[in-house]
Amino acid sequence: QGVAVQFCLPKTAWPPTSLWQRFDKAAAAWQPRTAIAVLDKIIVRATAEKAYGHLVKAQIARGGLTIQISPDSLDAVAAQMAAEEQRAKSPVLRAVYATALGKLYAMQQRGINRKAYQQKSRDCFARALKDPDLLAKTQAKTYEPAVERRDMSKAFGGDLLHVVAGEAKEYGLLNRYYEAHGNRRAACLAACLDLRENHSDWLYTRSGKQHYQHAIDSLINVYQDLDECGELAIDHYEAMDEDAKDIVERRIRYIDWAIAKWGAWPRMNILRNKRTDLTAPQFNISLQERQMLPGKERKIHIN
């Protein structure tokens, strides 16, 4: 059972990129023992030089490869990572290890122990998030777990809190924290992500889409003075009723309205591209018969 964890590393990355290139090459060729040997070198150097982002990345990659080689080794890998968490003297580093361990457990979606692992994952994330003030004061550039939408990171101030909470899918916590501390831009995005994470299943039915739209519109009323509200507008568009008779006209009107209000939000190009698609020339072709035989003429009606 494989574990794949993506990390975003700074351009001035330590250790030398050649080590990670050697790891990538070995992993791509499915030479796990060679890849683990390279990771061990990275772990030793990262530990000595306190390059924590690379250290965590290497530890998780090593654990993932070990589990791929021996699927029954998850508990041993997790125990080793938990020991690293306990040995860490920095509370920030302990939070990062707890996050990594929580992610490792969270990715175990199969097997009879799935529910137990999910609970362990929640426990790890709870440890990681027990001091949100500390995480909010720590810049994430030293610790580089992947963020689902890195273009949102600026609003979050580049802090470690949004990285850890994002991995834990605790967007509601983020929304409440940022609201309480006056960062409405981050609170808006956190509310949007929380809605996506917990209520995306509403989008599968017409009535559910209506509930989703109402929830989005409530958030828009709160955050409409912010450019970040454009992210909510994107979700509103995606939830529009596809079966409405005038859906194309309604969508175009909504896009124009949203762009006029929040056009500065970088991801509004999504709606601009949607508008281009909606207004592109279209035609329909109808065939009188379902089967077409070679060498036999058929009439094609183009509307």
What are the language-model segments listed below?
Residues W14-N303:
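Extracytoplasmic/secretory-pathway proteins
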